[in-house]
Amino acid sequence: MSRLRNSAQLQLSKKESLGDNGGALNTTRSSRQKQGKYGFTRKCGRLVKEQRARFYIMRRCVVMLICWTDHNNNNSDHS
C-alpha cells in the first residue's frame, strides 16, 4: 500500500515539475537541433574564454618573474 502511495506521489511530483503542458516533452525537433548547435558553440566559447584567462595569468606570472629576477640582479651588482 505504501509503495502505491509513493509511486503516486512520485508521478504527481514529475507532473508538477514539468508543468501543465508537459514541459520538455513538447520540444520540437527543430528547437532541439538548435539547442545542440548552440550548446556546442557555448561550450567552445566557454573553453576559449577559459584558455584565454589561463594564458593571461601565465603571461602575467612570467613577466612578474622576469621583472623580479632583473630587479634582484641589478641590486646584487651594486652590493
From Swiss-Prot:
Biased composition annotated in UniProt, kind: Polar residues: 1-12
Membrane topology type: Single-pass membrane protein
Tree of life domain: Eukaryota
GO biological process: negative regulation of cell population proliferation; shoot system development
Encoding gene per record: DVL8
Name of the protein: Small polypeptide DEVIL 8
Record Pfam families: DVL
Keywords of this entry: Cell membrane, Developmental protein, Glycoprotein, Membrane, Transmembrane, Transmembrane helix
Family: Belongs to the DVL/RTFL small polypeptides family.
Key word Transmembrane present: yes
Biological function: Small polypeptide acting as a regulatory molecule which coordinates cellular responses required for differentiation, growth and development, probably by restricting polar cell proliferation in lateral organs and coordinating socket cell recruitment and differentiation at trichome sites.
Glycosylated residue positions: N26, N74
Chain segments carrying region Required for DVL/RTFL small polypeptide activity: 39-70
Keyword Iron-sulfur: no
Primary localisation category: membrane
Any single GO CC term annotated in Swiss-Prot or TrEMBL for this entry: plasma membrane
Chain ranges passing through the membrane: 55-71
Region feature (Disordered): 1-37
